[in-house]
């Protein structure tokens, strides 16, 4: 029987006609001479009725064999349900199909969990039986949304003159940052390919090639410890443009993101997006990816603290640190136990403690430190944080990086507790002017904040070549880089690139590469720059993360068809797995475990 309509797409126009539907049995109910089957496909479900008086005894006996998740083809007459039988909870709840023919296309074992959205089952079971998990409507909605996003991306870039160009999956290992996944070469014994962490160099070479506008929805690989928003293999929306400056890239990406929201969600997002410098973001929010759906900004009270009688505050400022606070509105009634919990929370970010002022509704004040302050000092601190009766003011005193990390995380924690991070609300932000370099204490050298091909900020270019520059001077150099942040999550990052060999050589030098090392790893790129490279820049968006946020999910595993676990394993296929000794011999390698 050939399908004539999808289960979720029956309409009034088809009432009275014979239709054929295919799908899986969601539920079967036996009422004596009537059998009701809810048949499901990816569009929804529809009720099928087997009435022994209408369909005959033979067909009815066949319907009695049907169980959950059987795959069926059903032909019948579409009718309206009686008013008392209407189900208002599903789009097709006014209709039912009175069965005339049935074909069991495939029987099914009893599944290890119910195929339904409100599922309470361990994720390891879901991943082991992923093909069953993906039958659930919410998982199918996630993948349909992912398709809509990628279609909107491709349509947009095609309309704006971009070429979708594939770059190699087997490439050269240039370890800088995360570990590479290595692939041994059978025909070149002792040598290895690497799976790409990013197509960065190849897309820059596309610009040197004169292709001008490149885009690729590309798989990337990083051998790193996983989190809720990380996978060993992931997908990027990768973009590069020639003859552009920063604002050209940002404007184009704003249009693309707005198009995705419009086409995939039916949501209009205002452009241009807000911009903050890295320094502003860290000072005001304690994070380079702040969630701007709520305020609760960090307020600096270091100048008041410097002259106060509270030794913790005064000592921190004298040691080159700072004192900052946030106002948790309406939390003035927090108990000492609750405040102690917050103190333990900030200690996980290396803060030594948490000071507080609780302003009671009746004007009373509870505090861990105001007894050491004058009334004027206390009043000034409360004024700066815009404290009102019922508020809880929370303070951290330490070095700037610790204050930012601890208070920034506490701000998000309090935002969650107070319900300020509203789902369904989207706040987009560009963070610009990142540092170009950061000092790595373990390796005793500078590393690139983004990557080695990021161009310095035009205003700081002369500082890159300054003879005898101190570590502090080099750390203060800004990058011509930018990140797009959505609801406190980094959605993508990019930069204007270096396109001249002398500057790229200098960048490698600052990162501790000898000329020989730079030539061995990146000689082909350096040589390409000598044949006329245009100014260029680009960006890469994490597609998995983007779809996760649009879908309102907490993990990218929910928007990837077949994801890995937190230990980078595939529970369904049992990958990674051991291989036969013969395979290792052919590759000229052996394991040591």
From Swiss-Prot:
Cross-referenced InterPro entries: Aa-tRNA-synt_II, aa-tRNA-synth_II, aa-tRNA-synth_II/BPL/LPL, Asp-tRNA-ligase_1, Asp-tRNA-ligase_1_N, Asp/Asn-tRNA-synth_IIb, AspRS_core, GAD-like_sf
EC number: 6.1.1.23
GO biological process: aspartyl-tRNA aminoacylation
Subcellular compartments: Cytoplasm
Binding positions for L-aspartate per the UniProt entry: 176, 222, 450, 497
Region listing for Aspartate, in residue ranges: 200-203
SUPFAM superfamilies assigned: Class II aaRS and biotin synthetases, GAD domain-like, Nucleic acid-binding proteins
Disulfide cysteine pairs (residue numbers): none
Keywords for this protein: Aminoacyl-tRNA synthetase, ATP-binding, Cytoplasm, Ligase, Nucleotide-binding, Protein biosynthesis
Binding residues for ATP: 222-224, 231, 490, 542-545
Enzyme class per UniProt: ligase
Known catalytic reactions: tRNA(Asx) + L-aspartate + ATP = L-aspartyl-tRNA(Asx) + AMP + diphosphate
Main location per the UniProt record: cytoplasm
GO cellular component term, pick one: cytoplasm
GO MF, one annotated term: catalytic activity, acting on a protein
Coiled-coil positions: none
Site positions (Important for tRNA non-discrimination): 31
Function recorded in the entry: Aspartyl-tRNA synthetase with relaxed tRNA specificity since it is able to aspartylate not only its cognate tRNA(Asp) but also tRNA(Asn). Reaction proceeds in two steps: L-aspartate is first activated by ATP to form Asp-AMP and then transferred to the acceptor end of tRNA(Asp/Asn).
Subunit structure: Homodimer.
Family membership noted in the UniProt record: Belongs to the class-II aminoacyl-tRNA synthetase family. Type 1 subfamily.
HAMAP family: Asp_tRNA_synth_type1
Protein name: Aspartate--tRNA(Asp/Asn) ligase
Species of the source: Symbiobacterium thermophilum (strain DSM 24528 / JCM 14929 / IAM 14863 / T)
Lineage: Bacteria, Bacillati, Bacillota, Clostridia, Eubacteriales
Gene coding for it: aspS
